[in-house]
Amino acid sequence: MTERPPFSYDEMVTRNAGFVTPAEQRTLRDGRVFVCGIGGMGGAALQSLVRAGVGNFSLADMDVFETSNMNRQLFATLDTVGRPKVAATCAAIARVNPHAVLTTHGPDWVEKLDDILPAHRVVINGMDDLAAGIALYRKARQHGATVIDAYTSPLPSVTVVRPGDPRPEERLGYPTLGIDWRAITPALSNACKAAEALYVIVHSSSASHIDHALAAGLIAGTHTRPSFAPMVIETGTLMAFEAVKLLLGRDSGVDHRGVFLNPWTMEVERPRAAPVAWVRERIARRLLARMMA
């Protein structure tokens, strides 16, 4: 049996040369990223960052891998189905970069954000849990952390919410302001989903790329979120790029409102100007009303 050569971080990142300088590579190696939700988008972002050479991660996810995850979650395989996502993902990362420093958090991680966030200025939100996401955003503002996220949309998207930016619940008009995240009911959660869906319809071509009946079920909480590998993995890749920019102090063309990447037309869709958005919102409200009827 051939002996495996010893791992070399420098050799692993050799092909990064030209994209980042040696000094920037050292910055990535010393960088820290908190990823909550390491399934689809979060898992894709995480794998890209590991292979880019980021050296320190804190990971949180309460779920186990299921067969239905295998259509888009990079760490879901026949070997990991039935295993806790955090443990299985850590094992996979160790097979890529055994020098990566991994800190894991249990089901109570939301309660420990005051301890987690001071050490992380870059956070990737890969969760579907809306209430936990609201708690994350509130605490990120307090601790000066930037949250990279994406919309619930059939198109790849990415948002970068810096500490001074409005939270999604403020910007999108969620009915959760002033409510403890633990007290967010399913009805409130569905109202938040509807508010997000309205923004997505107004500011992107998403409505042209999804089955409306299925989307209505998602908003109503009667259907699980549809996920397609190219969309999910592309979204995770966009998130990883934004994390790299933040770690390296590079400028980004993405703000708290985000952008959509339409792979069907190869266009970048940005927030629409106010007069156009005003007209489209009225159309979108009628569309949502028909969808929910």
Which functions belong to the PLM regions below?
Residues 30-38:
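Beta1/beta-strand and adjacent pyrophosphate-binding region of the FAD-binding site
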Residues 224-247:
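Mid-domain beta-loop-alpha active-site segment that forms a flexible
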Residues 41-42:
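Hydrophobic/small residue at the entry helix of a nucleotide-binding pocket
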Residues 119-230, 263-293:
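E1/E1-like adenylate-forming module used to activate ubiquitin-like modifiers
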Residues 86-122, 127-134:
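A structured beta-alpha segment of the ubiquitous adenosine-cofactor-binding alpha/beta core
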Residues 49:
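Aromatic pocket-lining residues of Rossmann-like dinucleotide-binding sites
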Residues 1-19, 245-293:
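Phosphate-binding loop/pocket of nucleotide- and phosphate-handling active sites
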Residues 54, 59-97:
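Glycine-rich phosphate-binding loop and adjoining beta1-alpha1-beta2 segment
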